[in-house]
Amino acid sequence: MMPGDWSAERLSDRLQIQEVLYRYCAAIDRIQSGALMDNVFHTDALIDKAGAPYPVAEFVAAVAARHPGVPVASHMVTNVLIDFIDRDSAFVESWCLALERHPPATAEGGTIDRVYRVRYGDRFERRGAGPWRIAARTFILDHVQSSVVDFALEPPTGGRIEGRRDADDAIVRMRVSLGLPPV
């Protein structure tokens, strides 16, 4: 298949691949390990963050262990480039901007806000009649910016719904109430 194939079938494939990228962000931001395994990665996928690929299950376990200590996180994927290798595999480059707030940096308080610019180099595969999923992901870290912040969001006084990184998040509750999966 040519990288520039814009047939109806390929447009559908492109949208399905983009949906997987968006579901990755939602699963990471809500710390939904099950959604990462069910909706994003093939179970035998490999992750490469430092030149030594390892199983996706280890990555998911590390996310589950690390992210509860990060009270605020937001991952946004953009600049998605999809090149089809053949009918059922594609190379996908995307950019991710991740914003994270980390616990107090000093004994005096304050938090650390970090902005990460990351590129993902993904090999997507559609196996059999199954959905598109990531078979291999390489993380390329382009930039990290850290800032100590000496203020925090004021406690809610009404009229505001605050986001959460767990099953009590308002969107998760809305989805579940409609019979949809959390992510």
Regions found by a protein language model. Name each.
Residues 105-112, 151-152:
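Short, surface-exposed loop/helix-turn segments at secondary-structure junctions
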Residues 117-159:
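Short beta-strand edge/turn micro-motifs at domain boundaries
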Residues 147-183:
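Acidic/histidine-enriched, glycine/proline-rich intrinsically disordered or flexible terminal extensions
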